[in-house]
């Protein structure tokens, strides 16, 4: 069983040498890295022509405020 695992590890290391470098979103840097990744993904979604776009908030209607008990 150990020998089979060793072969798989060696094969995966050989394949990884030919790949392009991975993009680092900072996910391995803890909480601040996760926040940075979420920020960058949000910017990408807001600027994507097929994406949801920027959040637009409706204006507050004064009548709704006045009717509040």
From Swiss-Prot:
PANTHER family xrefs: DIURETIC HORMONE CLASS 2
Single GO biological process annotation from the record: body fluid secretion
Similarity-based family: Belongs to the scoloptoxin-21 family.
Location in the cell: Secreted
Molecular function in Gene Ontology: diuretic hormone activity; G protein-coupled receptor binding; toxin activity
Keyword Zinc applies: no
Region (Disordered): 46-69
Listed Basic and acidic residues bias regions: 60-69
GO cellular component: extracellular space
Signal peptide: 1-21
Highest taxon, organism lineage: Eukaryota
Protein name as it appears in the record: U-scoloptoxin(21)-Sm2a
């Amino acid at each position: 069983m150990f020998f089979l695992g060793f072969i798989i590890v060696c094969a995966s290391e050989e394949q990884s040498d030919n790949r392009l470098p991975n993009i680092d979103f900072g996910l391995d840097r803890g909480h601040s890295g996760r926040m940075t990744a979420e920020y960058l993904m949000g910017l990408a979604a807001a600027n994507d022509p097929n994406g949801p776009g920027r959040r637009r908030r409706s204006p507050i209607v004064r009548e709704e405020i006045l009717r509040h008990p």
